[in-house]
Amino acid sequence: QSLKEPINTVKVNILGTVLALESCRKHNVKRFIHASTIYVNSADGGFYRSGKKAAEDYVEEYKKIYGVNYTILRFGSLYGPRSDDTNGVKMIVKNAILTGNVNYYGSKKSIRAYIHISDAAKACVDILKNKYKNKNIILTGNKKIKVPIFLKRLSAMLKISKKIEFQNKKYTGHYTVNPFNYKSRKGKKFRLKSSVNFYDGLLQLINEVKKEKL
């Protein structure tokens, strides 16, 4: 969406962040929790990455200039219940259920460390501890999943026999294996004590999508 709406991306990701920071400064908020993305260390991600990267700069500058404490959360590939139709995993699942086709916009070599929303939610509570104050935290799943294997399992779960289609367009804004291919902006990886098995979470999402009014 940000590839098509660069101006709106600036309004939401940059201006929206600055307005929130300014409000925190005026009202002496103890800490600003900022939702960012692992794409800030990537050459991929398009305007979305650019907006998030600029927003992080403002968060850090507000600390330097005004003393507004922060924690930056760099989320990886989220999935799970109550995700909207822009979520990558949900789009794949919903399309498969509606059309009987399993499609992926990206490379066959793609790998993701998917993180279930419940694991991410628990982590968001844990990072309120003082040791995470003024830190950049990376929130991804514990296990790396090869996308072709995930898609094969999805096909089996939905009893789809058609061949999986990879539509590797010239530029989709997404990384293939490693997003960290840009000038490093240091972040500490958050270690999940326990996590939802990806395929258990996938089945949960499939059942939820089937219940929706498609």
Predicted feature residues:
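N-terminal Rossmann-like NAD(P)+-binding domain of SDR-like oxidoreductases, especially those catalyzing
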Residues: 1-76, 208
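Hydrophobic alpha-helix immediately C-terminal to the catalytic Tyr-X-X-X-Lys motif of short-chain
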Residues: 54, 58-62, 92, 150, ...
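Active-site loop of classical SDR/Rossmann-like NAD(P)-dependent oxidoreductases
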Residues: 87, 147, 168-185, 194-196
